């Protein structure tokens, strides 16, 4: 399941989300607020107001997956909401940072270089 993440895009729904919503409510939020296709291979990540709970919604073949994480101590390093846009595309590495309790604004390792010719 997590191995398939490498093929998918990851979007954060900025601002707090009422996590009492389940699959139907979150997929409606994806289509109407985020203006995205909930049936795509993308992963949609939602966080509550206190930033201690998180849900990830994604479609796989014949049905939805809904992952839920609750922190017993601490908060997720969720970015601040702004007027526009309603979502933020992040990298797979940044999602792992969030799940590990780190903020997205981490100092990055050396950027990968893509050369065509050596010499």
Feature names for model-found ranges:
Residues 1-119:
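Polybasic/polar functional segments that serve as interface/processing modules
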């Amino acid at each position: 399941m997590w191995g398939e993440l490498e093929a998918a895009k990851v979007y954060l729904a900025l601002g707090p989300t009422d996590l009492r919503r389940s699959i139907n409510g979150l997929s409606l939020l994806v289509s109407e607020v985020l203006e995205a296709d909930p049936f795509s291979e993308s992963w949609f990540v939602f966080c509550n107001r206190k930033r201690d709970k998180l849900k990830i919604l994604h479609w796989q073949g014949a049905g939805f997956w809904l992952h839920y994480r609750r922190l017993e101590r601490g908060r997720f390093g969720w970015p601040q909401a702004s007027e526009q846009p309603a979502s933020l595309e992040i990298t797979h590495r940044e999602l792992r940072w969030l799940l590990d309790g780190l903020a997205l604004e981490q100092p990055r390792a050396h950027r990968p270089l893509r050369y065509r010719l050596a010499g």
